[in-house]
Design a protein with these regions (language model features):
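Short, glycine-rich nucleotide/cofactor-binding loops
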Residues: 58-67
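Nucleotide-activated chemistry modules centered on ATP-dependent adenylation/adenylyltransferase
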Residues: 1-58, 77-361
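Histidine-anchored nucleotide/phosphate-binding helix
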Residues: 68-80
Length: 361
């Protein structure tokens, strides 16, 4: 296994190359994100909020983690927006995350809506997605997006402020795990959902990237804005300290790096991804932090070693019990072929992605 001389990415990362000095293509190309600019963000916020059809300027989805809490603070206290918050209850929220959200919405004096699908249906979705594709995060992502679109539409909200940060831009699998056509194919193959359950979960069962883009243009769907891509981000530790002071946010003190502690299944999914792909989000995020100058490579390696990604997480048995999985099931999961369902993604989405890339050239 080849490891970059500057960060901790390995040759398991798809498309990664190394120069003669052993430096990966991300590091050698100075792959550090530059914000689009706060002035541009403010112009977008001011323009889009005039399209509201109700009392709220923006919807802020909350998970209880750092980024979404920080976005909530910025929206209310910095950009003076009238905000509605929502959470998709995926069945795996940590109690710490739930408590963080409750304190934050009280301090910011905002309304909070929790969208909760049927537990038994969710369990069938997660179990069968994991057994067939080795991943459950994509299904959760589909549920989050569908519900945030619905809440925004129900309340006439013109935009959604999403807490995704540049730190995560290279953190996820290239597999299109949130493709609805792919999701439908896997669920039909599993035979675990009725048509009604499928439609209830998806909410917009025929949605694709082209329909979504057109819908946003004509006001059928809200505009998605990622504020952390426009402004200079606080380092991870400083962001935690800031929202602790302003929102009484509590951190997971059991580990040094606490992104995604809001979901108790995250260590499990990282373990599975590493076994199947040879890398996972922590490796990517720590490498991005190295390139941003937040930590040294040595520090990244120490943090990564402390995560014990290659070992079964402490709550491994709990996750198996929740999803009615056996050790034999997990043996099969870890043998899943990477990107097994890529050929079943939406043709419209494929074409749309190519078109967007061509336009950006």
């Amino acid at each position: 296994m080849k490891v970059c001389k500057k960060c901790i990415l390995t040759d398991a990362y798809p498309g990664l190359t190394f120069n003669d000095e052993g430096v990966c293509s991300f590091c050698s190309s100075n792959h550090v994100f530059e914000p689009f600019g706060e002035d541009q963000l403010i112009r977008i916020l001011e323009k889009v909020k005039t399209r509201k059809r109700g009392e709220y300027d923006a919807l802020v989805p909350l998970s209880g983690g750092k980024d979404s809490m920080y976005i909530l603070y910025l929206a209310v206290k910095v950009y003076n927006l009238k905000v509605l918050t929502m959470t998709f209850d995926n069945g795996f929220a940590s109690q710490l995350a739930i408590d963080n959200m409750e304190r934050a919405v009280e301090k910011m004096n905002v309304k909070h809506i929790v969208c909760k699908p049927d537990d038994k249906m969710l369990k069938r979705i997660y179990k069968n997605m994991l057994l067939r594709s080795g991943d459950i995060c994509g299904a959760c992502g589909i549920g989050i997006k569908a519900n945030m679109y619905k809440v925004a539409n129900d309340y006439g909200i013109p935009m959604i402020l999403i807490g995704t940060s540049p730190l995560e831009e290279d953190s996820f699998l290239p597999d299109t795990t949130q493709d609805i056509v792919r999701f439908k194919y896997i669920m039909k193959e599993a035979g675990c959902l009725s048509k009604k359950e499928m439609n209830d979960f998806l909410i917009y069962p025929d949605l694709n990237l082209l329909k979504l883009a057109i819908g946003k243009r004509i006001g059928r769907f809200p505009k998605e804005v990622r504020p952390l891509f426009f402004i200079k981000n606080l380092p991870d530790k400083e962001m935690g300290e800031f929202i602790t002071k302003e929102l009484d946010w509590k951190e997971d003190t059991t580990r040094e790096y606490s992104k995604h502690f809001d979901c108790i299944v995250e260590p499990f999914t990282n373990y599975v991804r590493y076994q199947i792909y040879g890398y996972e989000r922590r490796m990517c995020q720590y490498s991005t932090m190295v390139r941003r100058g937040e930590i040294t490579k040595e520090k990244a390696l120490a943090m990564y070693e402390a995560d014990h990604i290659m070992d079964k997480p402490a709550n491994y048995k709990e996750i198996l019990d929740r999803l009615d999985l056996t050790e034999k099931n997990m043996e099969d999961v870890l043998k899943v072929k990477p990107l097994k369902y890529e050929k079943h993604i939406s043709k419209v989405n494929k074409l749309f992605i190519r078109l967007v890339k061509f336009i950006k050239k």
